[in-house]
Amino acid sequence: MKQISIELITKGEPTTEKVLESISQQTFGDYEVTCVNSSYNPMVAELLKEYGVHEIPVKPHTKHLEARYLAHTNSTGEFRLLLDSTRPLDKNTLETLLYKYSKFRAVCIREKSLGQGFWVKQADILRSLSEHSDFQKNGSKIAYILPRFYREDVLNNAFKFLKQSIDNRLFTEISYGEHHLIYDAAKLEPSDITITDEALISHYEDESSKAIFRKYHWYGKSQRTLNLLKFDSNVNKLNSHKRPFSFSTFVPKMRTIPIRSLRTIAFLIGYFF
């Protein structure tokens, strides 16, 4: 058994190789990588094989929650890192998570934005705003930044609850909000969770208004599926990602009106139409 399992999902995004390369350069070596691959492209499977990844090939339209479940059930590590193929790691990410934060049952990981242009800068400010305003060190709440690094037993219990609470058809249709569902199902106490002091993951942001609109339009459509859930979860509440207002967040909130407006309009169009 490895100490850390990286549970990766990919649809064949161009940044997949960057993520795999970042994993191969880790200063900590006792890990395994399991990747659920829903790409049509056979070159993605070859790439995963080249990097020694345990591939779980699935149908191209496999949704995110099912992909996360398959990655988890095919991994063996004592700790689990939920990763996407748009999020490369810093070279010391695994080492830092294990030796500095492993006493916690779940860890939220600060990120930094990758890319160029106006929309990337907007996303970076918004990310900093989320990390600043929605996580409180005294453990009162986590509303927007969600854990990616879990102890194995926490994820076991979370997926067990989700499989028991969601019928199989709906489980396979959930393509958005899976991180929030997993977090809610884990039923953690505030003292179980922390957020890293460092930015240990990077994120390739959408660089065009068209890409942002397409993504959040899809999120809006996917929200309809979440409304079918029979148990109480923040993920099926439209205000679950609302950032609290305070004096210290006023300026960044004003500066990010363009991206927040674009995301909101796209989401609502997808949700209602």
Predicted segment positions?
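Short, well-formed alpha-helical segments that are part of the catalytic scaffolds
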Residues: 12-25
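Acidic donor-binding segment of Leloir-type glycosyltransferases
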Residues: 22-57
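Glycine-rich, basic loop-to-helix element that forms the pyrophosphate-binding segment
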Residues: 59-75
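Short aromatic/hydrophobic "clamp" motif used to bind/position activated sugar donors
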Residues: 80
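Conserved donor NDP-sugar-binding/catalytic core segment of glycosyltransferases
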Residues: 91-120
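Short, flexible, basic/aromatic active-site loop/helix in glycosyltransferases
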Residues: 109-111, 115-141, 145-147
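Acidic donor-binding loop at a coil-to-helix junction in glycosyltransferase catalytic cores
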Residues: 165-184
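Non-catalytic, C-terminal membrane-associated alpha-helical segments of glycosyltransferases
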Residues: 210, 214-273
